[in-house]
């Protein structure tokens, strides 16, 4: 064997990835001596790993190794945690990999993972550490210590510590509950079962001797766990009724090993050529470093002899004990080097190299949804040398070494090699040859994936725990604090400064007075005597800190915790966000950031499973120049909506037509032949005319074309067919791509059913006849090729190559000079399909001769066995045969969006929120989805940033190319990307121009995220309405979120459903996980868990806005009320020589924040509503105040503080004047008893004033709020009467009857609140009348009943039936249970409301509409359709006129479906997208055909100005009418739009729309 590359390399790997523990780790050695790795060393290693990860983000787009380590090579340098590892199986470790005691030097992390922030042991110290990051808590702790010393006048130290203990305890309990769910999921995951080989020796790790420290931790965990389970059980018994009403809050993601039965007959037999299939979308490894012995160079020279030799790892000559068996064990017990057997539907517990599978050809299928969000199956291959391993005894005899690269987070790259010795057949008695086989990502099963459609797979563990790729992408669960909470520290510091000033004044004044007179004033002295003025002032200072401590209110933090907890409960209880299908409410997992949800400016969303259902449906096709299929897509609905058509009515009519067409199509198929696999409900390709052509009613030529097309769909794929028993039976297809499954399913429905694979071929039932088609070769799809091909021998002996792929790619490979008419017609049809938002593919074929195929196959086999540049060689060979194709036709597939996605995106856009899509899917798919969900539209220019790997060879060249593209695109906006522009961008919260969208791929993103280009890229994105980042890794997603969050200083929200979204969910200010059947890690790491994307609108626009406004108002009122109370005490010091005497009886001070004033302000924070939920959704522009952070500002804070000081003056001096002027006052002042009476005079009006002030600032005066105000005011009277009636009140005894019988007291009770609140009332009235906010106008309209229609629609939505799956798309634009609003446009909602009662939106709201610049009457200004009620009445949509010209709707009476309705939009699409290789254009495809070359890689869009853009045909207007621009509106005024008709510009004739 070759020597290892470096000693101790694994040790650095372990150090770089392990977390710091509370104690050092013990390494047990043979002699019993202990080696310890110090905590400082571990922390240093951890910091080094963090720095490397951060640097990797800018280099690779993901926290990967440095870019100078080439893919495919295994570096031998030991640079900390980046050293490779070598694993030995049934071979002794070489001496250089052992320590002096004979134990392995390499150390690997355990497979036990923890996403929870706390453990039972670390909870208390760690939680206290986080809580005392709050500066107020530190201050209160200091006060508690200060009160202990009697010289400072502390009354009761124990009582003073109660508030701090309460807030610390309440917060700790809340944090414990939040973290408990993560802990439970961690426990379930770590204890999930796996079949692990036991009874053999794994030499790569030493025996795990549990140390005393770990035993202690385990004992504590079991102890605290048992206590918690007891509490939980008791709580569940008490909460049985609540549990029956609401489903369990635990995500439906429990870890269970699936034990679905496996039918071996369903196993796919893959042809031998699939041994070298490369399924990953990354290029092949580059040539390895010659100094690194990853493979044997001798084997390369004998490639001709060894290319057909199958390796065998089993050494039958070595003796074995026979005790090895596969037994169930927990995930956490797996270690590197273990043999594991994975069964069908099992989740992968670690990163595993596949040695053998149940398939004789070594293929297995995995679902990677947890990693990249894709539910389609991917093929993984076992190593050729390990396929003979079947049983435990085979594993005992297997001798080999695995050389692996170090752990790195790139999900699409892996490089390693397996080495063993074997005798060759031509020299059976000679020495065993050293053999080697490369290991790639297609041989690796990653943790978090699921094994599908494979009976079992056997492999060895190469990475565990935090070394696995999924965990390296997950990051560490952050501790998030709300933005207001962070900003609150500044205000607390300000109040602390005011407190210090007050204390200094008191100390100086008391010291000076004491030095002058050495005697007290006539009033009572409370302070301590220091003996000298300086010492007296020093004591007075600290005594004043204690007395004035309420200026920094600890009660505020307690109240905020209560408010946030109740807000979280109401969010959880909102049935409008309850997803009944999976029994999933909205679960707040981080209770302390609900107000952050009300300030979100950027939302980052995953695509697959988040925006879409990832359910592909075959909708349309074009075959031999004839279009087929009927459908109504989201994109069509969006176009109709822009044209002013009532989408709901249009969709209803078209649905009826499609339903009738489906009945006719099914009847025709049944008449053609009895297809037992046709299920009516599964049929998505609705084309009666296709059925007629298939039956030959329109001639044999088209019949042959349709048959051959469907046969091509049934043969060109890599799907796995499963037959489900039933009557009739059902064929289910599992594929690498859901598109592929949709194509094969449609072929099945049309009578070409794939039955499975056997004997190296595909079995197909063709129109009732079973046929076998031998598969000679499969050329797999990847993102660079954008196509896949299958070479099949037909029954007549011909060899045909079927190729399907992107239309631009196929057109560039068609045979020159043929099918000119068909190519042109097909291009037009594909363009129409693309306008409808469908994903298009082209199907082509080529006939091969025997000699041609044999020659190509020889070259292919040589390329497939190459050890270097294998992918490049395979692509080069494939390129030679995928040429001179004959076009068969094209397909159009719809990726179904989740319910309500377009409306939710539209609402969020109206609110001023920018939505970016970060997806691991390919660019073409993301663009199609962008059109479907209204992120993109035909009026946009797509800015494409694309740097290809083949464009350069060095990092500097890549950076230069990326910089040039950024500079070119920034020039469109007259920008350079400098610091001044960034400063302006940080202050600008307006919506960007709606005419630009940006698309970028992951490889380009790697370079634009570098430090030198990041700022320019950010500023370019800021100018675009939509941004789509495609083919991005999880770490790149997090890097993009971090760039926007920190670069623009905005609030961000990330939403996703898979493990690949965890990093960005944790990076964003607010993380939202979508719960489903998979992706529990996203829910585990999120702050909120919801069931569907559409619930985001209610979470953000309703609860988020409410929470932010409530918290802002609560904090302001808290500071205000404590200012009154504290400054009243301060004013009293002026009359008692600043001796820091309490003017209030001490129980008043305790009761003030506990009972007198806290309940109303807490209810304000929990229940106050400026507008209802339905109005919040009907007018989403109200949310903009949160984006601009106008609810909580420093100006507001200081105004409330000044108001509090003013009212403290009134509250103190008015009662003081009344008391001094009464006969009860002594001639020389007040004695001790009179101090308490004056305090009562001041306290009662102050409490009434404070509660009245809170009521004034409250929008919603419901019975509970009014009751809390009344009870709070009454309670001070009640307490005073009860307490002073007892002798426990001491000097306050009998104060109530003495005070309450005085007329002056009742006069103070009336005059003081009136004078205090009068300025506030006057200012508020003036503001509402003369300078109303948007919400003030909307509230007036709501009070008038203008939103009654929206309220009724919300009630109907909550009580109405849920949308049925599979219902037509057009109907869904207005559906979705619990959406809380009607899904019509905001004016259409009130079509039945009288003209004078329809909502009139304020100008600021209209200005902030990102989709249309609407005036106060709803009239559209720029490039938008007018949808107000008046304009609907002025220009009603005339269906008859619309059908005449230029558009014709599909009719079921026509033999062929009409595409005229779609063709109207083609001319608007072509100027912006003609040069795009992601958007089909007939003109573009024609140029591709003529030049026979591939498309370019950049978008060069120059928008053309033509009359069609402003034609009435697209807006539901007369052809002679034109839209006015904003300048015309401003010039003529809004009154011009009230006329019945709008004339064209004088002197300019109307232009006809382009045809």
Curated annotation (Swiss-Prot):
ATP binds at residues 606-608, 740, 781, 783, 786, 804, 839-840, 919-921, 1031, 1037, 1060-1061. Residues 22-37 have a biased composition (Basic residues). It is a multi-pass membrane protein. Residues 1436-1456, 1540-1555 have a biased composition (Basic and acidic residues). Gene3D superfamilies: Calcium-transporting ATPase, cytoplasmic domain N, Calcium-transporting ATPase, cytoplasmic transduction domain A, HAD superfamily/HAD-like. Residues 1406-1432 have a biased composition (Polar residues). The record marks 554 as: Involved in the release of the transported lipid into the cytosolic leaflet. The keyword tRNA processing does not apply. A 1,2-diacyl-sn-glycero-3-phospho-L-serine binds at residue 1320. The chain crosses the membrane at residues 135-155, 157-177, 492-512, 538-558, 1124-1144, 1147-1167, 1201-1221, 1238-1258, 1263-1283, 1303-1323. Mg(2+) binds at residues 606, 608, 1057, 1061. Keywords: ATP-binding, Cell membrane, Endosome, Golgi apparatus, Lipid transport, Magnesium, Membrane, Metal-binding, Nucleotide-binding, Translocase, Transmembrane, Transmembrane helix, Transport. Residues 72-82 have a biased composition (Low complexity). Residues 156, 513-537, 1145-1146, 1222-1237, 1284-1302 are extracellular. Its cofactor is Mg(2+). Its EC number is 7.6.2.1. One of its GO terms (biological process) is phospholipid translocation. One of its GO terms (cellular component) is plasma membrane. GO terms for molecular function: ATP binding; ATP hydrolysis activity; magnesium ion binding; phosphatidylcholine floppase activity; phosphatidylserine floppase activity. It is an enzyme of class 7 (translocase). Residues 1-134, 178-491, 559-1123, 1168-1200, 1259-1262, 1324-1555 are cytoplasmic. Belongs to the cation transport ATPase (P-type) (TC 3.A.3) family. Type IV subfamily. This is Phospholipid-transporting ATPase DNF1. The lineage of its organism: Eukaryota, Fungi, Dikarya, Ascomycota, Pezizomycotina.
